Every structure is written in C-alpha cells, then in structure tokens.
Amino acid sequence: MDKTSLIGIILAFVALSVGMVLKGVSFSALANPAAILIIIAGTISAVVIAFPTKEIKKVPTLFRVLFKENKQLTIEELIPMFSEWAQLARREGLLALEASIEDVDDAFLKNGLSMAVDGQSAEFIRDIMTEEVEAMEDRHQAGAAIFTQAGTYAPTLGVLGAVIGLIAALSHMDNTDELGHAISAAFVATLLGIFTGYVLWHPFANKLKRKSKQEVKLREVMIEGVLSVLEGQAPKVIEQKLLMYLPAKDRLKFAEQGEAQNGEKKEEEA
C-alpha cells in the first residue's frame, strides 16, 4: 500500500477536526445531507458529463494506483542487469540473451530485448518503444485529468450550495435564531467543496502525475539500456550512461556499493 496517500488523508481529517474543535464548531454541523448531496453527487455528475464512459470506467483502477505501491524494477536494479547482458552479448552474441529474456517479468523490457535479439534495427526498436511510452503517458494524463477536473468542480459546487442555503435562510428573516442556524448550515457546502477539491481531488491528480513521470523515466532507462546492449557498448559505458538518470546523491551511493562489492570479490578471490 502507498502509505503516503493514506497518511495524508488521515492528517487532513485530523487537521479539520482539531480546527473545528479549536473554533468551537460542533461536528454535528457537518451532518448536512443537502450539502453532502450537492458536493458529492454534483461532482460525480459533472465528471461523468465531462468524460467519456471508457475513461470513467477506469476510475476504480485509478484509486488502486493511488493506494497501491508500484512493484517495479528500480533504476538501481536495472543498471547491473544491463551491464551483465552487455557483457554476455559482447562475449557470445545477442542470441545468447534469449535465455535471459525468459527471466524478465517486465513486459516492456522483455519486448525490447526480444526485438534486439530478433535482429531489429536500433531505430526501429527506439520508435516502437518510444511510441509505447507516449501512449502510456497519454493514458496516465487522461486519468489524472479526471481528478483535476473534480478538484475544479467541487469548490464551485460549494459556492452553489452556499447560495442555495442562503436562499433558504432568507425565509427565516423573522426568526433570528433560525436565521443564524440556516446561514451557518449554508456554508457547510462551501467547506465540503473546498476540502474535497483541494485536499482530495487535486492531490490525487498530482500523485497520479508523479507516478506517471516516475514510470516514464524508468521506461526511458530501459530504452537506453536495450539500445546500448544492441550497439555492443561496454558494460562500464552503459553503467555510466544509465547512472545519469539518478540524482547525484543516489549515483554516489550506487558507486560506493559497487566499490564495496568489488572489494568483497577481490577478498574472496584472494
């Protein structure tokens, strides 16, 4: 599970609850069925109108992506894999990688290696893999757009709910107590609209965009790795090239780990 999503939501509700207590607001004030209906049902309705059915059906999948930790290869794991494959390909030829392909779980990487072993040109492989990444990125952007739009609609619907509440409040002009209660209830819709829009929907969209960028970056590393192996580049050259995709701090850490492993190997050989 992606703990940051869950922790963020919990902290948001805690912050709202503590703020209400400090301001002396009763939790029962939020129990406003009309406001909840306007915000939740209104937001859902607006999103359904704005997007085609095919994209709306993917919403449950988007929630799984939000709350599920991605179990993907990391760049740190890919670098030694490509170094090993490059060494094998230089020593025995690309066909020697056929056995290694079976051990690859990532479908994108497996397809790239298969095309390389089949003798496809570097340009063809780059075009195919790049187009696949672009198509994936478009799908991800479409999913994030649903939550972005929901975050845009919710606060506006909150204003709509407040206006409806104020219209209802005007019917109690002859009763000061009822008028005050009606006005406070009118702004519950605004609170819910702003809260769901800027604490849930917009952050959800941002999380999807960040996860998409991470996956795109990983795919770019795979493309460069496959093409480098195809071109017969030295393992050390491939390692240095792919390390550029890591932050400086992670590159240094990777280098230190590599030196430690080399030291252990020398001790074993001695």
Curated annotation (Swiss-Prot):
GO terms for biological process: bacterial-type flagellum-dependent swarming motility; chemotaxis; proton transmembrane transport. PROSITE patterns: MOTA. Keywords: Cell membrane, Chemotaxis, Flagellar rotation, Hydrogen ion transport, Ion transport, Membrane, Transmembrane, Transmembrane helix, Transport. The keyword Transport applies. The chain crosses the membrane at residues 4-22, 36-53, 153-173, 182-203. It is found in: Cell membrane. It comes from the Bacteria. The keyword tRNA-binding does not apply. One of its GO terms (cellular component) is plasma membrane. Residues 204-270 are cytoplasmic. It is a multi-pass membrane protein. MotA and MotB comprise the stator element of the flagellar motor complex. Required for rotation of the flagellar motor. Probable transmembrane proton channel. Each stator complex is composed of 4 MotA and 2 MotB subunits. 2 A subunits and 1 B subunit are thought to form a single ion channel, so that each stator complex contains two channels. NCBIfam families: PRK08124.1. Belongs to the MotA family. PANTHER family: CHEMOTAXIS PROTEIN MOTA, MOTILITY PROTEIN A. This is Motility protein A. It comes from Bacillus subtilis (strain 168). The gene is motA.
